[in-house]
Regions:
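Short, glycine/acidic-enriched loop or turn micro-motifs at the edges of active sites
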Residues: 85, 141, 164-165, 180, ...
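Short gly/pro/ser/thr-enriched loop/turn and capping motifs at secondary-structure boundaries
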Residues: 114-115, 143, 163-168, 182-184, ...
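Acidic, two-metal ion nucleic-acid-processing modules in DNA metabolism proteins
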Residues: 94, 99, 235-332, 388-395, ...
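Short alpha-helices
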Residues: 93, 170-224, 593-595, 599
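Generic beta-sheet signal
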Residues: 108, 137, 160-162, 176-178, ...
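Intrinsically disordered, low-complexity regulatory tails of plant transcription factors
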Residues: 143-144, 226
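Acidic-glycine-rich active-site phosphate/pyrophosphate-binding loop
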Residues: 164-177, 504-509
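Hydrophobic helix-and-loop "lid/oligomerization" segment in the mid-to-C-terminal part
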Residues: 2, 7-133, 152-154, 204-427, ...
Length: 679
């Protein structure tokens, strides 16, 4: 179960804004719920921010001058990119622009195995090729040693980047990065491709007219893919880019849009994030990032289609590899359930593809709601890890705590990476536990609803009005609404039982909602039950007729008290870690015989159920999550059920003989703890 937070709009401000603009009340409720209570700021958000003068970014004028001089002299220029979607799109834009200027131009992107950023081997190779000027895109801000070598080899260097600068900047003719402390540009949140886009505008004399028409579509893809805030200038870039993307002249993008079965009349940032960007990223994860660049640059239809097919195949491999790693993790957790008792998960495996461990880490965070470090071990005993966390637990500081074991690490509060010797993984795991387990309060993944949706809010005009907030993305997510006390009238299986549709009543409103990836027989509800749901609203069009679509993001039976759930879950994990708790508490969570009988009877009746669903069905004042989990552990100890901790699935097992629950490992352990606590 995930934690919910339901925000409240400001009804006074909503009413005030409705008198000043033609936005719908539901849209204004969302905006005021997100803290936008000043009308000028509201107007700026929907009007879109004009792109500021590219020359406001520190060193932009110098960069343009150096590059223009190299173009005029026909010096060999190399664009040095990065292997992710942001780096690929940055490379594509700048290469295409300089080629159109008649430059003597090439590009270089390191393979993932070489690591992020500049490397000495590549620099030596570029010098041998006769490169006179290196222009980095989406990297370079930390390349202090590499920059010195470039100077020694009598090459010039222009750095364009958007990552946080170190204290010491590299030696370069120009360093174009909005995050420089001395950069006067007011907008700081550009992706690497946004910086490259502005460099092209600077090379064009400062005008955005040509570069917007030629590159806004590619720039939008890189911006969405890099998950930078879709506010301010980024919002403007993506909005314009989506307009151009529908009729793009880039052959590779046209094939990709068609093969991904995207509707050209309804292209949005979600389509980029889930259908286009992952395919481009797959080339850097499993093949060569050069394939993605060639896809975007190719002017030959046959070549472009072949490149797209290659990318799609690589993306299929990526998905398969993710699934294989997830299966290994599930098997490990089922064999070692104590893994889940810790506040931060550390999981490692030999041969796990390091190109996907970041994605796996994100999936683990979403599923278990816990910060985690996923580590891949190679044949030489070297290990590389990727981590994801939640706001409130700084994974970078955790890495600092473990720094003595790490060869290299970096990141920020919610994400990071590391490398170490495989022999140190066990020590690292213990140090992570020592750092995180004792924390008094620990954050959890939280789903945020913009408002409690009332029946009268649900109408076509209101739902259609939400489109004004697009494009959605980081810091401007698609609106999410809470619906509390929804009565289930009918349950309908979809796609051979893979998904579920419900017909429901919500006050005076009668509607349908879709719950993806939930088989009806695995639902926590039945006809007649009341549900609380978090939903996204949209518009379906069929035979030119519009209707409201409701997609359920999360749901639970009405009446569940989430604070009690999470407090009891935390206590259970403390117990399993062996932390000493008061004797009075331990007594309360040891189930009575009658409580054990009641839980067992329910399980034997339903046969298969998840622990969370069981909690929602039978929890009460005396049966909290901690006590319920202990009941399940007791039954598992005695072979009365099969319990798979990785998925929390409980399956009834027909007993072969009578068992004595009193001598179960779990009860023995609890009684020992009770004795130590001073019975």
């Amino acid at each position: 179960m995930k934690k919910w937070r339901i925000n409240r709009p400001d009804p006074v401000k909503t009413a005030e804004f409705m008198n000043k603009c033609d936005l719908k009340s539901l849209t204004l409720d969302v905006m005021t719920s997100r803290g936008l209570t000043d009308f000028d700021s509201l107007a700026d958000f929907f009007k879109g921010e004009e792109l500021s003068d590219p020359f406001l970014i520190k060193d932009m004028a110098i960069a343009a001058e150096v590059i223009n001089k190299a173009v005029d002299q026909y010096d060999l220029i190399c664009i040095y990119g990065d292997y992710d979607c942001d780096g690929v799109t940055s490379t594509t834009i700048l290469y295409n622009y300089l080629e159109s200027m008649g430059a003597n131009i090439m590009y270089y992107i390191p393979e993932r195995e070489a690591g992020y950023g500049m490397n000495m081997e590549a620099i030596e190779m570029l010098a041998e090729k006769g490169v006179k000027l290196i222009v980095t895109v989406d990297n370079g801000i930390s390349a202090v040693e590499e920059a010195e070598r470039i100077a020694e080899l009598d090459m010039e260097l222009v750095i364009t980047d958007h990552h946080q600068p170190p204290e010491k900047l590299p030696r370069a003719r120009a360093i174009v990065n909005p995050h420089r402390a001395d950069c006067p540009s007011s907008y700081k949140d550009l992706a690497g491709v946004g910086v490259a886009f502005k460099l092209c505008a600077a090379l064009d004399g400062g005008s955005y007219d040509t570069v917007m028409e030629q590159y806004a579509d590619i720039c939008a893809i890189g911006t969405v893919a890099d998950v930078v805030p879709l506010t301010g200038e980024n919002r403007t870039i993506v909005k314009r880019g989506l307009e151009y993307l529908a009729n793009t002249e880039i052959l590779g993008l046209n094939y990709l849009i068609d093969k991904a079965k995207l509707d050209r009349n309804a292209l949005d940032s979600t389509g980029i994030a889930f259908r286009i960007a992952p395919v481009i990223n797959a080339s850097g994860r499993f093949g060569s990032p050069l394939t993605a660049v060639k896809t975007l640059l190719s002017e030959d239809p046959e070549d472009a289609e072949n490149y797209v097919d290659t990318l799609l195949n690589l993306n299929t491999q990526r998905k398969q590899t993710e699934t294989e790693i997830m299966t290994e993790i599930v098997n490990h957790i089922n064999a070692h359930p104590e893994t889940l008792d810790h506040r931060v998960l550390v999981l490692s495996g030999k041969g796990w593809h390091h190109g996907v461990i970041g994605i796996v880490s994100s999936r683990i965070l979403e599923f278990y709601g816990k910060p985690n470090v996923i580590i891949s071990i190679d044949d030489d005993g070297n290990a590389r890890g990727s981590a994801r966390s939640v706001k409130g637990f700084n994974i970078f500081k955790c890495f600092q705590h473990c720094g003595e074991l790490l060869d290299k690490f970096g990141g920020h509060e919610c994400a990071g990476g590391l490398s170490l010797k495989a022999e140190n993984i066990e020590k690292l795991t213990q140090m992570v536990y020592e750092y995180s387990d004792p924390m008094e309060k620990f954050p959890s993944v939280e789903l945020i609803a913009d408002k409690l949706l009332m029946p009268q809010d649900i109408n076509l005009d209101n739902v259609k009005g939400l489109a004004a907030m697009e494009p959605f993305g980081a810091e401007n997510p698609a609106p999410v609404f809470a619906m509390l006390g929804v009565r289930v009238d009918k349950i309908i299986p979809l796609s051979q039982g893979k998904h579920t549709k419900i017909e429901f009543s919500y006050g005076s409103y009668r509607g349908q909602a879709l719950i993806f990836s939930l088989a009806p027989e695995k639902a926590c509800f039945a006809v007649g039950d009341k549900l609380d749901m978090l939903v996204e609203l949209g518009i379906n069009v069929f035979n030119n007729r519009e209707s409201i679509s409701i997609r359920v993001i999360d749901h639970r039976l009405s009446g569940v008290k989430q604070e009690r759930y999470f407090a009891a879950k935390d206590c259970y994990e403390k117990l399993m870690r062996g932390e000493q708790l008061p004797a009075s508490f331990i007594r309360k969570i040891i189930p009575t015989r009658q409580e054990l009988i009641g839980v067992y009877k329910y399980i034997s009746a339903v046969k298969n159920i998840t622990l969370d669903n069981l909690f929602m069905k039978i929890s009460g004042d005396s049966m909290n999550y901690c006590k319920l989990h202990i009941c399940v552990d007791i039954f598992r100890d005695k072979g009365l059920i099969e319990f798979r901790p990785a998925t929390m699935k409980i399956s009834y097992v027909v007993p072969k003989q009578k068992v004595n629950l009193e001598d179960s490992e779990t009860l023995v352990k609890l009684n020992e703890m009770l004795g130590k606590a001073g019975n």
